[in-house]
Structure formats: structure tokens, C-alpha cells
């Protein structure tokens, strides 16, 4: 169902916010779906107005002490009919039992958690964009209107 949607919202808090931006960019580049990356705390400041039945909402989440707020935001999207895709560690997945689809990443209980989690989550983000694009029939090897390099003049 995600592959036929016209839009998608991608959310995350703190260190994973750049991953939400990159995940949304990959969806745009190869599947031609309008997607936006947002910090989870910003959802009520506009993006929630776009959520309706079957709109995919993707969240990257790790158990870092702030996950309850993010899961609450995700629950609000779910209550408005969004299709929830959660890429998270087991602790977060266990708390968000309402998610339609989950991808579990390894958990880290050390000082490297914030550094390693974005690396692990980038793989499912890229695979999601790839499979959505393939489902839509787009050419993932030669996306339209993209240049391999940017020249600054």
C-alpha cells in the first residue's frame, strides 16, 4: 500500500533526525513519492494535518529515554488512519504494538548507541525506498532528472 500512496511522512527524534531526512529523500529520488522528514516533536506543528487513512508514516526510533513521547505521536498518527512503519529496537517495537510493519535493529547498551543506531537504520531505510520504487515500476538504477554529481559555479 505504501507504494501507491502519494505522500509519506518520515519521523525521528534527536540523532536519527538526519536519517529521517535522508530516508525521505531516497523515497523521492527513486520512487517519486512525495516524502518529508520531520523531527517527531514537530508532528503537531503541521505535518499531522496531512495524515489521513492509509498515509504511510515511517518512524526511526531507539530506546533512549525519549521514546514514550515519540510513540505517543505515532499513536496519534495511527488513530487518524495512518499506516505505521516502525524501524526500531526491540524495546520500542514492544511498546508500539499498533504498528502495521516493523523492522527490528540490534540494541546497544553502551556509549556507542547514538553513533551505531543511525548506521544500522540506514540500511532498512534504503531498502524500503528501493522496494517501494520497484513496486511502483520505477528504474532504480537510472532515476529521472537526477545528476550523479553537482557542479557549483
Regions found by a protein language model. Give the residues of each.
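Short alpha-helices
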Residues: 14, 99-153
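A general structural motif
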Residues: 35-45
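Active-site-proximal loop->helix
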Residues: 46-56
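Glycine-rich phosphate-binding loops that contact phosphosugars or nucleotide phosphates
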Residues: 60-108, 128, 136
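Long, compositionally biased charged/polar accessory segments in the mid-to-C-terminal portions
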Residues: 14-16, 70
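Single conserved hydrophobic/aromatic residue that forms the stacking wall/gate
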Residues: 1-7, 11
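Short, structured coil segments at secondary-structure junctions
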Residues: 6, 31, 53, 80, ...
Amino acid at each position: 500500500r505504501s507504494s501507491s500512496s502519494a505522500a509519506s511522512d518520515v519521523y525521528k527524534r534527536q540523532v536519527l533526525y538526519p536519517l529521517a531526512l535522508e530516508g525521505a529523500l531516497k523515497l523521492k529520488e527513486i520512487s517519486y513519492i512525495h516524502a518529508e522528514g520531520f523531527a517527531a516533536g514537530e508532528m503537531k506543528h503541521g505535518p499531522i494535518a496531512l495524515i489521513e487513512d492509509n498515509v504511510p508514516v515511517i518512524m526511526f526510533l531507539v530506546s533512549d529515554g525519549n521514546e514514550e513521547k515519540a510513540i505517543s505521536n505515532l499513536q496519534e498518527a495511527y488513530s487518524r488512519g495512518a499506516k505505521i512503519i516502525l524501524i526500531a529496537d526491540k524495546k520500542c517495537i514492544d511498546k508500539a504494538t499498533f504498528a502495521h510493519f516493523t523492522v527490528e535493529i540490534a540494541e546497544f547498551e553502551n556509549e556507542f548507541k547514538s553513533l551505531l543506531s543511525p548506521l544500522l537504520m540506514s540500511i532498512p531505510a534504503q531498502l524500503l525506498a528501493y522496494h517501494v520504487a520497484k513496486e511502483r515500476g520505477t528504474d532504480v538504477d537510472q532515476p529521472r532528472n537526477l545528476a550523479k554529481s553537482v557542479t557549483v559555479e
